[in-house]
Design a protein with these regions (language model features):
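N-terminal Rossmann-like FAD-binding beta1-loop-alpha1 element of flavoenzymes
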Residues: 3-30
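A generic structural signal for alpha->beta connector loops
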Residues: 26-28, 72, 125
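Glycine-rich, phosphate-binding/catalytic loops in enzymes
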Residues: 25, 48, 120-124
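Short N-terminal binding/cap micro-motifs at the start of the first secondary-structure element
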Residues: 16, 37-39
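Conserved acidic E/D residue at the C-terminus of a beta-strand in Rossmann-like folds
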Residues: 31-35, 44
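N-terminal Rossmann-like dinucleotide/flavin-binding domain of flavoprotein oxidoreductases
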Residues: 41-98
């Protein structure tokens, strides 16, 4: 079972930002997420994020991942099934493995609430948006 100082659950902007700050301090850090970027992947054009000129959600997610990995942080794409508190930390069980950490950061993101309309997915980003500023 691998051990880390800090494990971060979620690889969206909050999780990767936390990972960058932790990894920059030379602290052993693992990000666990089912995917890279989370809901950022739903953003086709990103024009209102400081420092990102004419980008997209997936491009920003990849940029954050690259920055995190440049500080020797580790990332695993898996689903967290259970977190147990243990003496001196936490045990995190995923679909494929188990990890130990002294501390955890929960940044699991969110899933958009679908309206349940007929053909809703067909009109995603073509009139139906899940972003408050789109």
């Amino acid at each position: 079972m691998q051990e880390f100082e800090i494990i971060i659950v979620g690889a969206g902007p909050a999780g990767l930002s936390a990972g960058i700050y932790v990894a920059r301090q030379n602290v052993s850090c693992l990000v666990i997420s089912k995917d890279l970027g989370g809901q950022m992947n739903l953003i086709p054009r990103l024009e209102n994020y400081p420092g990102a000129i004419m980008s997209s959600g997936p491009i920003l997610a990849k940029t954050l991942e690259t920055q995190y990995l440049s500080f020797k942080g580790e990332i695993v794409y898996d689903t967290v099934e259970k977190i147990d508190e243990t003496e001196g930390g936490f045990k995190i069980k995923t679909t494929r493995s188990e990890y130990k950490a002294k501390a955890i950061v929960l940044a699991p993101g969110k899933v958009p609430n679908m309206l349940g309309l007929e053909n809703e997915s067909q009109y995603f980003n073509k009139g139906i948006h899940y972003c408050t500023k789109c």
